[in-house]
């Protein structure tokens, strides 16, 4: 009986000890812990984003080996901190969180445009490669045979918009693209490192990471994109067919092959983004928009800075506050003659509060007039979300910023040009077809 009693007591004691041990273990993370983590991460990242943004601005507007190094170091710091925080955030994967908090953790993971592996050495390598390629692009120029001087990208863009000599256009198109072959090895390594970084964050590759930022699964995003493209595809196939036929009539079937893709160098835009600059060739006979915006700017003696003022007044008319003086003091509006810069137009938010700027080498033409309104659309959107928490001081998704900019650009209608005094009278409604084709 003693043995039986003692064995029973011992079993109870062991069971009790096991219960106590389980009860005294470390508690798992809670939603409150996740909220505190996000707030701490935002505070840390905001400071790093500001530092990296300033370094990137200097590097974009004053390209030297030294500014490349400074920008790469700042970018590597952001990458390292973000990857470390993303790894720390994994502790909340199994926690039942409110949807907004769960989304904040996903935004933390995807806040890097390009992820990098967890290894600090590889993070630094990726930052150097990224900055170096951007610098190469910004410094890019083409030196035609027997030319007195090399051509910068803005100079090539002007020639591309105005020339109708197919040999010259093809020469410029191919010449500009000689800037990229030296980056081939760098780019391949860039993709390798970025895919490895995305994998460390739990994604299959960088593409899946990018597709994860639209409040749906990456596969759902692909399906939605295909659905939307299916809606507009018939229209764009018809438009491209028309443009190809008009270009073939202008240049001949030996240059524009029937049934083949439109030759990229014939569209008047270095990246084949629009056909507005060749509208005189591709526009229907009775669909003249009734005005040429470039000529309107010239006849009204509107210089490059005044073009930006027109953009600001557009937003003034909608009730927005004027741009701060720092915008005018710190933006880059003209291509400088004493240094290399990245001329490609972009909008910047340097301190996530009020230090907004644009960077572009403005030409006095209609295309850049529209681009200015587009870029300012980004700036005013940036000002609109500055009261949000740091992770939410960004576009609702990667496409929304461009949607804002393009919506503003589409507002540059004949009626608007009349209102601001650039055009005397708006063309009749039957000219709308030409206007729509130009912006399609």
Feature annotation, model-predicted:
Residues 367-383, 402-406:
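Active-site recognition of the HExxH zinc-binding catalytic motif
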Residues 20-23:
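C-terminal motif of bacterial Sec signal peptides marking the signal peptidase cleavage site
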Residues 225-235, 395-437:
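Post-HExxH zinc-binding segment in Zn-dependent metallohydrolases
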Residues 1-13:
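Bacterial N-terminal signal peptides that target proteins for export
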Residues 119, 180-184, 222, 229, ...:
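Hydrophobic alpha-helical scaffolding
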Residues 316-325, 351-353, 365, 379-391, ...:
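Secondary-structure transition/capping motifs at alpha-helix termini
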Residues 148-155, 189-359, 428-439:
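Active-site-proximal, well-structured secondary-structure segments within enzyme catalytic domains
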Residues 26-189, 207:
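N-terminal helix-rich structural modules
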């Amino acid at each position: 009986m003693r043995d039986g009693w003692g064995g029973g007591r011992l079993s109870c004691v062991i069971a009790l000890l096991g219960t106590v041990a389980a009860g005294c273990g470390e508690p798992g993370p809670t939603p409150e812990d996740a909220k505190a983590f996000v707030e701490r991460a935002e505070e840390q990242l905001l400071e790093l984003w500001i530092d990296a943004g300033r370094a990137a601005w200097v590097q974009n507007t004053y390209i030297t080996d030294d500014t490349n190094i400074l920008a790469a170091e700042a970018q590597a710091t952001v990458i390292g901190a973000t990857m470390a925080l993303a790894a720390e955030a994994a502790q909340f994967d199994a926690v039942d969180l409110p949807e907004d908090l769960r989304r904040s953790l996903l935004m933390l993971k995807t806040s890097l445009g390009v992820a990098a592996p967890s290894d600090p050495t590889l993070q630094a390598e990726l930052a150097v490669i990224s900055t170096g390629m951007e610098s190469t692009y910004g410094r890019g120029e083409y030196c035609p045979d027997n030319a007195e001087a090399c051509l910068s990208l803005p100079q090539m863009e002007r020639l591309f918009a105005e020339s109708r000599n197919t040999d010259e256009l093809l020469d410029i198109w191919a010449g500009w693209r000689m800037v990229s072959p030296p980056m081939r090895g760098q780019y391949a390594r860039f993709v390798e490192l970025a895919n490895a970084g995305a994998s460390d964050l739990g994604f299959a590759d960088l593409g899946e990471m990018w597709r994860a930022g639209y409040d749906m699964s990456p596969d759902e995003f692909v399906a939605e994109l295909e659905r939307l493209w299916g809606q507009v595809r018939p229209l764009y196939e018809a438009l491209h067919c028309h443009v190809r036929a008009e270009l073939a009539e202008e240049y001949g079937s030996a240059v524009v092959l029937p049934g083949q893709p439109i030759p990229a160098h014939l569209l008047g835009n270095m990246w084949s983004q629009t056909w507005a600059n060749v509208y005189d060739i591709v526009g229907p006979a009775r669909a003249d928009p009734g005005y040429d915006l470039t000529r309107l700017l010239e006849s009204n003696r509107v210089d490059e800075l005044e073009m930006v003022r027109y953009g600001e007044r557009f937003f003034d008319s909608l009730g927005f506050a004027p741009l701060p003086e720092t915008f005018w003091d710190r933006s880059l509006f003209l291509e400088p003659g004493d240094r290399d810069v990245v001329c490609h137009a972009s909008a910047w938010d340097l301190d996530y509060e009020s230090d907004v700027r644009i960077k572009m080498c403005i030409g006095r033409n209609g295309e850049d007039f529209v681009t200015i309104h587009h870029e300012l659309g980004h700036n005013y959107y940036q000002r609109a979300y500055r009261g949000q928490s740091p992770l939410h001081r960004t576009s609702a998704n990667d496409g929304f910023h461009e949607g804002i900019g393009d919506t503003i650009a589409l507002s540059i209608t004949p009626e608007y040009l009349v209102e601001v005094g650039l055009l005397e009278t708006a063309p009749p409604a039957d000219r709308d077809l030409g206007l729509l084709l130009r912006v399609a």
